Amino acid sequence: MRQFKNGRNPVLPPDVHIPDGEGHVMPDGKLYIYGSFDDTEDEYCSDKYYVVSTADMENWVIHEEALTGGMVPWINDPDAPKYPGIDLTHPTPFMKRILEETSCRNDGVEKEEKPAEEEPVFLYAPDCIYKDGTYYLYFCASDDSEGVAVSDRPEGPFGDPVQLPCGGIDPAVFIDDDGQAYYYWGQLFSHGVRLNKDMMSFDPENIVDHLVTEERHFFHEGSSMRKVKDTYYYVYADMERGKPTSLGYATGRSPLGPFEYQGIIIDNDGCDPESWNNHGSIECMNGQWYVFYHRSSRGCRQYRRLCIEPITINPDGTIDEVEMTSQGAGKPFGPGETIMGYQACGLKGTVYIGAEENPGAGYCEKLTHISDGDEAVFRYVKSEEEYNSIWILSEGSGLIEVLLGGKTAGFVTVTDGVQQNSEIKMAAGEYELTLRFRNTKGLQIKEIVIN
């Protein structure tokens, strides 16, 4: 178990990459986040799950392993039932585009087939729910199989996994007010079904397909279900803006639809030059609704980190889109507070959040790969007095334009990691802080303090 105090984004320590966050307030009143675990730059997820929890959105506990791929008996078992994950006979517009691009790239290229025993055992996005004294963890694996494991504790460990009669990724679970449980899953194609009373089985004949679609709802993957008053909210990775970096939602009057598309809750495009997908949920904690989502880092589509933003559900049931912030569920950064470079919530250009681990110095993350014209955005800073200085811990050289609320507050020159000046000028208030880089030479940003 590991403890970490932080009320801002990203939520967890910089070396802990938990994407696909499903947030649930459990009977003990604490919020538990169930997600996958990224630990490589060339593959999504890994072979393990870790559950994180908090009682106050600031003090976090990273619990021990909840489930590992090695505990799932049917993975790579040639005799286990196989269920198709995606219907390739009826491609969506996105599928057609990808298939065409893949065909062009692979034209004349022979792909080496790996023996089954060499295939990695990865666990993709999970979900969890409590019923009658038991916590049920629904999970999916790299072979398109899906299953459920159980525990008497919300953080696990989970055991006794049972395979479900379906294939695909991104399971979600929901229990309605009458006690009936529902199961959702699918990539490109969405599916839902009533679970049996044992919470570990269902009748495949009762599966409802196409709950939300790419064509009508911009659905890509990452199903998540909630209910607010009499309205059911189907949250998912949304393709409306060309790639699934958004969390969108559709609403209905039944847990199995029909659902009407409503819009986007948050878009993580711009968190990294290679940002590609999003997956998350909404949940109410201590009277406040939040959206849980992730951001990629290190100039790749992986190393995704848990982030949180407050949201508002309007009287008419709609949810206004919110922007990514550095403050997250916490307060704006005040005078004298340290802002870490990796807390940037928006990046423009080639700059990204990179990592390094040095003997004796440990693990650290910073803004790196900075080119002329790049920008890094931090939302928000706040002061009751006039801003007059900024201190930037950095490496390399460059000229940094400091903008507050889009207006230039000053310029900072850095030479071989030594800051030459610190003066800025801006009236008191709350602002978006932007660093714009020029004449860069090996420039990297570790920390910022503004006064």
Predicted regions and their residues:
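Carbohydrate-active catalytic/glycan-binding domains of CAZyme proteins
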Residues: 1-411, 416-451
